[in-house]
A protein has these predicted regions:
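Active-site signature of alpha/beta-hydrolase-fold catalytic machinery across serine-
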Residues: 31-35
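Catalytic active-site module of serine/aspartate enzymes centered on a nucleophile-bearing elbow/loop
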Residues: 118, 122-149
Length: 149
């Protein structure tokens, strides 16, 4: 509810927002996308850990451009989190199939598939965070959501 109130206050000052969320922050984003689909211009999901259930109303996901960024995050140092990360990864194919089914405008960046390995769950704090930020910026430019780098 506080997140929605914040968005409502923002609407008085700006024409739209690009939301960037990390991990469990994805949990709150669906409600914002559903409630304010014309105000949310795009969503960047970084290592999203809680994606909506496939049987929920996902109509906003068909309207709002989305970028999903995932690293490999498979360190043996984090066994509990490692098991959670594996659970998230197992759900990704079904989520992507659902996005395809509703004709969502989304881009999936799997960093290991792009040859970028060794990231933690905290991509924004890793040594190559400038490279990842560059990928995100390039996507925003490609979508016409920002003018320059």
């Amino acid at each position: 509810d506080a997140y929605c109130k914040y968005i409502e206050r923002l609407q008085k000052h700006v024409d739209g927002v690009i939301i960037m969320v990390h991990s469990q922050g994805a949990l709150y984003t669906k409600e914002i996308m559903q409630k304010y689909p014309d105000f949310v211009k795009a969503v960047v999901f970084i290592e999203a850990a809680s994606l909506p259930a496939l049987d929920e109303d996902l109509s906003a996901f068909a309207k709002i451009p989305q970028l999903y960024v995932y690293g490999d995050f498979m360190s043996d140092d984090y066994k509990v989190v490692h098991s959670w990360a594996e659970s998230v990864r197992r759900g990704i194919p079904a989520w992507r199939a659902k996005l395809d089914e509703i004709h969502a405008d989304y881009t999936w960046m799997d960093l290991p598939e792009m040859g970028i390995k060794g990231n933690s769950h905290m991509l924004m704090m890793d040594n190559n965070n400038d490279q990842i930020a560059g990928f995100i910026n390039d996507w925003l430019v490609e979508k016409g959501l920002c003018d320059n780098k």
